[in-house]
């Protein structure tokens, strides 16, 4: 029986020591599911709203007791008796109870915790792993990890403007091999940093955050690490950037101010900056290359570089079908970053991924800076055939938990498992 019998919620801590919401959904037949929601550091202006208490005397105002109370007092009474296997109905009922476009009344953190826990409970009731329950019998593609091994921007207190520098093991033959490659490059990078007396502490997402004089220095270090680890850049491993351009966009002057480098660009100048980097390094993906509302700049970027690399909209699309629809209609970007807490329900997440795939856009399942041990996104990456996942570096248990879950899934699938590899990157297929 998949009828919801009880819903519980509690305040737990995320990987940055901030409170977040965890929910448990229990079913009449004895099955149960538990899920905890993540939280972002650089958040898009158009994201669903996570409800915080604002009490400065408790967790510096970041408590989530209001959201927990909304789960127990508002969502639970309305959902008890409903069928957890009807994900759409469960999510739709919560959206009706909230009644706002941004989920600001009850909190996206309250709604998402229940949405994910309900799916887990239904999967448990059916005796299926979450990826199989959500994705069906065809769910067998393991994603390429975009491993954030060097941090800047909002993820680090340094002069590096670009938020994430990632290694992409697209040339591997399996997820396990790709993960190993990324981990070995990560360790090689640490050795290089130590040799140059640069910081080897890790940031929120497990990547190193050395204070470098310029963004290109980070790329040079990673290329050196790839070489020292014994791999070939541009054949086995590639590079990806999350620029998070909204973070250094000046709305008044409409200029992009790279403070670390002491330079500023208009959108045309910035895309030429990217073009230059892509000609010198094997960059196959750039995320948030323009600010979230600079649609004109995004269009220029897509027209100029869209045929040669993946251009991912994170703050641009915020996992929202309305913003994604505008992007598809105008030919803006060619990929969507998928963050479940940007939109707030699994149903809306599924809708965004399906819309993207129908339009020929790729999708990248993603973590947030503030994570927990919850591994839902690992299962969703396989279930939704995303082909790519961003879940940090090869350190910090909150990041490695997702990688380990993907290793389990690959092992469980056995010979049926397929690694997305180079097939998911349009530019690499064109070079064949």
Swiss-Prot record:
(2R)-2-phosphoglycerate binds at residues 163, 339, 368-369, 390. Binds a second Mg(2+) ion via substrate during catalysis. GO terms for biological process: glycolytic process. The active site is at residues 205, 339. SMART domains: Enolase_C (SM01192), Enolase_N (SM01193). Its EC number is 4.2.1.11. GO terms for cellular component: cell surface; extracellular region; phosphopyruvate hydratase complex. It is found in: Cytoplasm; Secreted; Cell surface. InterPro entries: Enolase, Enolase-like_C_sf, Enolase-like_N, Enolase_C, Enolase_CS, Enolase_N. Mg(2+) binds at residues 242, 287, 314. Pathway: Carbohydrate degradation; glycolysis; pyruvate from D-glyceraldehyde 3-phosphate: step 4/5. It catalyses: (2R)-2-phosphoglycerate = phosphoenolpyruvate + H2O. Keywords: Cytoplasm, Glycolysis, Lyase, Magnesium, Metal-binding, Secreted. The keyword Ribosomal protein does not apply. Its cofactor is Mg(2+). GO terms for molecular function: magnesium ion binding; phosphopyruvate hydratase activity. Catalyzes the reversible conversion of 2-phosphoglycerate (2-PG) into phosphoenolpyruvate (PEP). It is essential for the degradation of carbohydrates via glycolysis. HAMAP family: Enolase. Belongs to the enolase family. NCBIfam families: eno. This is Enolase.
């Amino acid at each position: 029986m998949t009828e919801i019998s009880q819903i519980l919620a509690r305040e737990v801590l995320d990987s940055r020591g901030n409170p977040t919401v965890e929910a448990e959904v229990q079913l009449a037949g004895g099955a149960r599911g538990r899920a905890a929601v993540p939280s972002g550091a650089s958040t898009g202006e158009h994201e669903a709203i996570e409800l915080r208490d604002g009490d400065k005397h408790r967790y510096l105002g970041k408590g989530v007791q209001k959201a927990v109370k909304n789960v127990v007092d508002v969502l639970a009474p309305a959902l008890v008796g409903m069928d957890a296997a009807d994900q759409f109905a469960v999510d739709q009922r919560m959206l009706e109870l909230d009644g706002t476009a941004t989920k600001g009344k009850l909190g996206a953190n309250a709604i998402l915790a229940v949405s994910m826990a309900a799916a887990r409970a239904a999967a448990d009731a059916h005796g299926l792993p979450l990826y199989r329950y959500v994705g069906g019998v065809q769910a067998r593609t393991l994603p390429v990890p975009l491993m954030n091994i060097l941090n800047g921007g909002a993820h680090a207190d340094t002069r590096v403007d670009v938020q994430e520098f990632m290694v992409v093991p697209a040339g591997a033959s399996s997820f396990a091999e790709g993960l190993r490659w990324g981990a070995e490059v990560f360790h090689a990078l640490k050795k290089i940093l130590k040799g140059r007396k640069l910081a080897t502490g890790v940031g929120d997402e497990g990547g190193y955050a050395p204070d470098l004089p310029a963004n290109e220095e980070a790329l040079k270090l990673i290329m050196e690490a790839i070489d020292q680890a014994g791999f070939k850049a541009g054949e086995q491993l590639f590079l990806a950037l999350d620029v998070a351009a909204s973070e250094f966009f000046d709305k008044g002057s409409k200029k992009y101010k790279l403070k670390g480098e002491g330079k500023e660009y208009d959108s045309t100048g910035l895309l030429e900056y990217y073009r230059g980097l892509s000609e010198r390094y094997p960059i196959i993906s750039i995320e948030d290359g323009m600010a979230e509302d600079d649609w004109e700049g995004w269009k220029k970027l897509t027209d100029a570089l869209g045929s040669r690399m993946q251009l991912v909209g994170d703050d641009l699309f915020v996992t929202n079908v309305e913003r994604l629809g505008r992007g598809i209609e105008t030919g803006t970007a060619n990929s969507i970053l998928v963050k479940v807490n940007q939109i707030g329900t699994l149903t809306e997440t599924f809708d965004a991924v399906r819309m993207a795939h129908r339009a020929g856009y790729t999708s990248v399942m993603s973590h947030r800076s503030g994570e927990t041990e919850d591994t839902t996104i690992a299962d969703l990456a396989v279930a939704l055939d995303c082909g790519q996942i961003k879940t940090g570096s090869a350190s910090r248990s909150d990041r490695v938990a997702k990688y380990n879950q993907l290793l389990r899934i690959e092992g469980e699938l056995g010979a049926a498992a397929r690694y997305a590899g180079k097939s998911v990157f349009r530019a690499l297929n064109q070079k064949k």
